[in-house]
């Protein structure tokens, strides 16, 4: 399960160790332009990487690039990666990028802990339609108390907080606590494997898509602003993709 959680935390991309460097915008602009052009090529292919970018809006990406071109924030490859991730999320207007998340990251093994995710959502949002038909036995409750994927999620995410500090500060309020992240993964798993209707899953998935985009882009902007005031600092960014059904 821990290995699965680590894969989920691909959703949580870490960018670290920002080295001393002067702004090299024109070099980066060429690389970022190449990145956008490369996506155009990938959209015509059927590779694993192409699946991630099938939904990328090229015009949106070019406009996002223009917004950053007079900035002193993009100073090296780490910041460049922030741009790529943020623009990919901001400019993905369809569902392919979100489908990639579950197809490539969340594996069916998570289904083994489904009752624990149902129990967690029942405790956090008892009126959620995702658990309307869920039946959790006493035996399952006891099993979840002893060993739950929720505990693994909290353990890994708490370790991340030990490194980057409080999530609410790091993300400029986009995420208020580890519990927000755990709740997001919980809903994602129940949308993928739960027993609720397809209509309910569709509505809940749209909510998660917007939630993830808001988190990713708000956090990216937060990181960009930090680069302006503390370009020598060590920073991280977490982003992720959610599937479509």
Curated annotation (Swiss-Prot):
Localization terms from the record: Secreted
Tissue-level expression reads: Salivary gland.
Keyword list (alphabetical) reads:
Phosphoprotein, Secreted, Signal
Residues with PTM Phosphoserine: 33, 40, 92-93, 115
UniProt xrefs under Pfam families: DUF5442 (PF17514)
The signal peptide, as residue positions, is 1-16
- State where it is primarily located: secreted
Gene Ontology CC entries for this record = extracellular region
Is Metal-binding one of the keywords?
no
Purpose? Used by the larvae to construct a supramolecular structure, the larval tube.
Name of the protein described by the UniProt record? Balbiani ring A 28 kDa protein
């Amino acid at each position: 399960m821990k290995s699965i959680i680590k894969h989920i935390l691909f959703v949580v991309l870490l960018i670290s160790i920002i080295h001393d460097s002067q702004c090299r915008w024109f070099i980066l602009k060429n690389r970022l332009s190449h990145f956008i052009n490369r996506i155009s090529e990938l959209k015509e292919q059927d590779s694993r990487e192409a699946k991630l970018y099938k939904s990328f809006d090229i015009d949106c990406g070019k406009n996002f690039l223009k917004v950053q071109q007079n900035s002193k924030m993009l100073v090296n490859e780490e910041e460049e990666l922030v741009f790529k991730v943020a623009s990919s999320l901001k400019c993905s207007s369809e569902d392919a990028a979100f489908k990639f998340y579950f197809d490539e990251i969340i594996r069916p093994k998570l289904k083994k802990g489904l009752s624990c995710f149902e129990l967690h959502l029942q405790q956090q949002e008892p009126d959620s339609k995702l658990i309307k038909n869920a039946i959790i036995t006493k035996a399952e409750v006891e099993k979840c108390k002893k060993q739950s994927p929720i505990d693994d999620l909290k353990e890994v995410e708490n370790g991340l907080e030990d490194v980057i500090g409080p999530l609410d500060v790091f993300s400029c309020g986009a995420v208020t606590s580890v519990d927000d992240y755990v709740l997001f993964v919980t809903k994602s798993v129940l949308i993928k494997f739960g027993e609720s209707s397809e209509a309910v899953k569709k509505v809940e998935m749209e909510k998660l898509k917007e939630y993830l985009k808001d988190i990713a882009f708000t956090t990216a902007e937060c990181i960009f602003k930090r680069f302006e005031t503390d370009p020598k600092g060590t920073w991280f960014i977490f982003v992720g993709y959610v599937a479509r059904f």
